[in-house]
Swiss-Prot record:
Its cofactor is Co(2+); Zn(2+); NAD(+). GO terms for biological process: amino acid biosynthetic process; aromatic amino acid family biosynthetic process; chorismate biosynthetic process. The lineage of its organism: Bacteria, Pseudomonadati, Pseudomonadota, Alphaproteobacteria, Hyphomicrobiales. InterPro entries: Dehydroquinate_synthase (IPR050071), DHQ_synth_AroB (IPR016037), DHQ_synth_fam (IPR030963), DHQS/DOIS_N (IPR030960), DHQS_C (IPR056179). This is 3-dehydroquinate synthase.
Amino acid sequence: MKPMTSDVMPAAERKVRVDLAERSYDILIGPGLIAAAGGEIASRLKGRKMAVITDENVAPRYLEPLMASLAGSGMDPVSLILPAGEKTKSFEHLIPVCEAVLGARIERNDAVIALGGGVIGDLTGFAAGIVRRGSRFIQIPTSLLAQVDSSVGGKTGINSPHGKNLIGVFHQPDLVLADTAALDTLSPREFRAGYAEVVKYGLIDKPDFFEWLEQNWQAVFAGGPARIEAIAVSCQAKADVVAADERENGLRALLNLGHTFGHALEAATGYDSKRLVHGEGVAIGMVLAHEFSARMNIASPDDARRVEMHLKTVGLPTRMADIPGMLPPADRLLEAIAQDKKVKGGKFTFILTRGIGQSFIADDVPSSEVLSFLEERIPR
């Protein structure tokens, strides 16, 4: 794999810069960043009032050290603890978050802090984006998925019965603190789910990185330098795409590899994390995207098999049959896909591939082909 372009910092930390002119920000990666958060924030923001939003799973481990770090740096923090899980990304919980931010009297130089995984980051970022027409926002992601994907790039939002992430705004954070020590407390399933997003970056346009993951995934799972390297490469990859296409007018859509199928499967399971979590849906979706590309004679079936083999080796689901319980029929899944992506003249936009690391945007995929493909793969 080619060397990373992100800066090397003391104590095995990495720094990745998201270049968005006056809205540029740093992603700091390494152990101990939650305890050091107060100093990092104080060096960047003038405000002293902080509203910390977290969930009931993360709070017992990390809320107290974060609050102590903020207070120790002269800040006045308040906190709100929400239920954990995908169903928290809803209007029901958005309103209390907004009220908590207003109640904390957060002003222009103060900040809202998301302490948790992707759900907390997306929800909190949305609240920060709409309260006072935009408040400063800091991401402290505690899951692998959030560290390499959802905390970077400014996409925020909540789910709807019509589909995932359909209500939201673009609102960039002022800082991302990815404390890699927090990943040591994740369940194996949570870590694997986040790893699917790491693999995605190799499959989009970094075949050398995918090959490196095939050879080094065990070291990534074990922790240490390989894990930090994988996170830093992933963050740099996303930062480069976001800098080139912040509002997803073109290139950024490539980051949706596996997500069109994956989001439809999440909706089909009612966002029930016992059946399917986001990263698992992405894993299945990436295999489906490669298989569909092969079906359309765009890619080799060998590439789809290689992707499936790696994801299966690390313990991720790769087939719709791996999802517990019944799935709806193909036409219902197609309806969910239609909500997730724009349909023009009966044709879908998908991220397809010509091979490992050769993904591209296809905006003329016939819905009839997708329906036929799904009918073949839904377990009977």
